[in-house]
From Swiss-Prot:
Domain EF-hand: 42-77
Name used for this protein in its record: Actin cytoskeleton-regulatory complex protein end3
Domain EH: 10-100, 139-227
Task performed by this protein: Component of the PAN1 actin cytoskeleton-regulatory complex required for the internalization of endosomes during actin-coupled endocytosis. The complex links the site of endocytosis to the cell membrane-associated actin cytoskeleton. Mediates uptake of external molecules and vacuolar degradation of plasma membrane proteins. Plays a role in the proper organization of the cell membrane-associated actin cytoskeleton and promotes its destabilization.
Membrane topology classification: Peripheral membrane protein
Gene Ontology BP, a term: actin filament organization
Family annotation (InterPro entries): EF-hand-dom_pair, EF_Hand_1_Ca_BS, EF_hand_dom, EH_dom, End3
Predominant place of localization: membrane
Homology family: Belongs to the END3 family.
Coiled coil: 290-403
Protein's cellular compartments: Cell membrane; Endosome membrane; Cytoplasm, Cytoskeleton, Actin patch
Amino acid sequence: MSNKRIEQSEIEKYWEIFASLSNGGTHLTGAQAAPVLKNSQLRDEQLERIWDLADVDNDGNLDFEEFCVAMRLIFDLVNGEYADVPPALPDWLVPESKAHLVQANRALTGRQVQFERVEDDDDTPGLKDGFDWYMSPSDKSKYEEIYSANRDGRGDITFESLDTLYSSLEVPDTDIRSAWNLINPSAAPAISKDATLAFLHILNNRHEGYRIPRTIPPSLRASFEKNQIDYQVDNQRIASPAQKWGVTGGEETSTGRKAKFGETYMSRLGIGGKSSYRPAGTDFSGTKTTEDWEEVRLKKQLAELEAKLEKVESASAARSGGRRDTKPALVKRELEQLLDYKRRELRDLESGEGKSKIGASLKGVADEIATVKEQVDALEAHLRTREQVLEGLQQEIENEKSSR
């Protein structure tokens, strides 16, 4: 039996949304609920099916319980819990007050709940767990070069545009398509720069022997699923299955001698190293990533520093008279280097120099300046706290030395 349920914190959040939309009423019409539902960026036909599932009593409106059901279905779809809208409402999502209606409907239609099909790749031999969304600067630079060499006139990437890259990797076709579907749940014919970087990062890790993740962190998904107006009429036409789901007419990716991700491919294009290759057109690859990506990287760096400081504190607390190697100066220097890097980013953004000089809109630069300022303030406060901790530890060490 599934242990899934809607948590109390979710219910309280949904109630705030419901109350603001219903203006004190007990039900929401389609017009009232539409703005919130469409913010999910799901396709209209998916939202229609979600509405039909959530409207258990079939009155054409959603009461609060039904609204909670609809919001949870949307949340799970956006976060990759479902590949598509389920054909029937899962038992754990059926409101208790309406369970009899669902049972009666199933009895009349003869429709039974189907088991959800989960693609499990745990039986693939030799693959490792522990996929990490953090992109090192060298990896990110490599991804951006591949993106710049293959983007179209609108700055997007299609699945077919990277065929040559696929053939240079030791990654099965099924995994390549799984990665594409993961970062492109709306089955769009092309993806944006941020989504492309995430796609290449997944392929890189799979090439290195890590399993493809099943979900994308919400903060990362939001960074490449922002609502953007598409002025191209041809993009509104129905895309082929190959464009939507990364199916290339039955072709299989060939594999060869394993090399570092993208090296063979970039060598063919003349990218990287001392090559003079420059992609045609305006290069927006220098535009800084969103604060969501930066937040992930910064949190990882801070977690590593926290772990080092924790080791220092543990060694001091459990000292037994032996020689300790706490290296507080090294930890302090790493924190200072991280702060210096953020300050340089802030100066570049304010002066319009460096990477922010190309392709960044005024609004985007202002947002990034505010984000970096907040990060610098937080890091400075964090550094001051840790400096005090280090000073205390150093004082304890000196006291112990003097007492011997």
